[in-house]
């Protein structure tokens, strides 16, 4: 059974929050809806704190750090490979989970953020796959979440 331990931020409507422990700080990436009815796919915000359970998360100076429906929405855990950080992102330009963008985080400090697209994963390996919207990696395990087109014959 899950129990609420703490509310980290108040008066924030956030989607797909992703935590990262990097360079002596905890970083929280989240899609924020600033105005009621606005899309949660368009902008990515970043916050930092000394501890993951802190109630004093500081907004990043560059917020929103991404304003692009093709790469703002988080799509899984940030991972490290060959000494580089990668942030999986959803391409929601056509529909939810149209493709994944693997963003290489080039700069991550309290005052600067930069990333570039390192790869794109489109759901083209099977004609039944409509969308791909999550890529998570933990050790040797990689999980991809897809949506299938399952047509029923009546």
For the regions a protein language model found, what residue spans apply to each?
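Carbohydrate-active catalytic/glycan-binding domains of CAZyme proteins
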Residues: 1-154
């Amino acid at each position: 059974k899950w129990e609420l331990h703490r509310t980290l931020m108040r008066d924030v409507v956030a989607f797909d929050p992703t935590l990262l422990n990097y360079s002596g700080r905890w970083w929280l990436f989240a899609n924020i809806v600033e105005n009621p009815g606005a899309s949660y796919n368009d902008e990515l915000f970043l916050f930092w704190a000394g501890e993951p359970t802190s109630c004093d998360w500081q907004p990043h100076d560059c917020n929103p750090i991404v304003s692009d429906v093709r790469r703002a929405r988080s799509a899984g855990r940030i991972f490290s490979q060959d000494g580089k950080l990668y942030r999986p992102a959803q391409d929601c330009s056509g529909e939810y989970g149209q493709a994944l963008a693997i963003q290489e985080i080039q700069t991550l400090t309290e005052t600067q953020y930069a990333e570039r697209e390192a790869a794109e994963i489109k759901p083209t390996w099977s004609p039944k796959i409509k969308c791909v919207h999550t890529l998570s990696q933990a050790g040797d395990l990689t999980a991809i979440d897809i949506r299938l087109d399952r047509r029923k014959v009546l």
